[in-house]
Amino acid sequence: MTTTVPFVTCDLLDDHTDKDIQVLTPSLDGRFFKSYGARKIFSGQIVTVKCFEDNSRVKELLATDGTGKVLVVDGGASMRCALMGDMIAESAVKYHWDGVVIYGCIRDVDALAELDLGIHALAAIPQKSNRQGIGEVGVNLYFGGVTFQAGCYIYADNNGIIVSKQKLID
């Protein structure tokens, strides 16, 4: 089990006004990130993957050591299929990932709610994705008004998601 130091994103913003911290904003079309995992507060160093309706790279990455890391997935906000379900999420727990943020959908909602993993996604859908081995790892991502770069730090709770180039907590 990975341990995250308790924090509140609001307080991190208030306490670090001298740092360049980005705040993920809800989109004008009403898309909001929702928490699906049992872990409601999570943080870590960002690992990025860009994929559209193909979770091959997500599955591969979450089967590697994720200690102190959060996978950020740009799924193009697709509402047609899920990029993570219970089996991939169980792998993430097994390999000590702190969390996963998906700009797209997940599935197996009830099973995910039981896992000690931070999970934020736009929505749930029962349809699984195609696996064709397509996706880019380690690329800069941009959604919700935030640029996600591999190696930066992400902090998520029920208030929202923030990103910083510097580590804000130990």
Swiss-Prot record:
MF GO annotations: 4-hydroxy-4-methyl-2-oxoglutarate aldolase activity; metal ion binding; oxaloacetate decarboxylase activity; ribonuclease inhibitor activity
Annotated residues for binding of a divalent metal cation: 108
GO biological process: regulation of RNA metabolic process
Binding residues annotated for substrate, in chain numbering: 85-88, 107
Keyword Lyase set for record: yes
Xref: CDD domains: RraA_family
Keyword Lyase applies: yes
Cofactor-binding details, from the entry: Divalent metal cation.
Pfam families assigned: RraA-like
EC number, UniProt record: 4.1.3.17, 4.1.1.112
Entry coiled-coil feature ranges: none
UniProt xrefs under SUPFAM superfamilies: RraA-like
Catalytic reaction equation(s): 4-hydroxy-4-methyl-2-oxoglutarate = 2 pyruvate; oxaloacetate + H(+) = pyruvate + CO2
PANTHER family linked to this entry: 4-HYDROXY-4-METHYL-2-OXOGLUTARATE ALDOLASE 3-RELATED
NCBIfam families reported for this sequence: NOT-MenG (TIGR01935), PRK09372.1 (NF006875), PRK12487.1 (NF009134)
Similarity comment: family membership: Belongs to the class II aldolase/RraA-like family.
Function: Catalyzes the aldol cleavage of 4-hydroxy-4-methyl-2-oxoglutarate (HMG) into 2 molecules of pyruvate. Also contains a secondary oxaloacetate (OAA) decarboxylase activity due to the common pyruvate enolate transition state formed following C-C bond cleavage in the retro-aldol and decarboxylation reactions.
Subunit structure: Homotrimer.
Name this protein carries in UniProt: Putative 4-hydroxy-4-methyl-2-oxoglutarate aldolase
Natural source organism: Acinetobacter baylyi (strain ATCC 33305 / BD413 / ADP1)
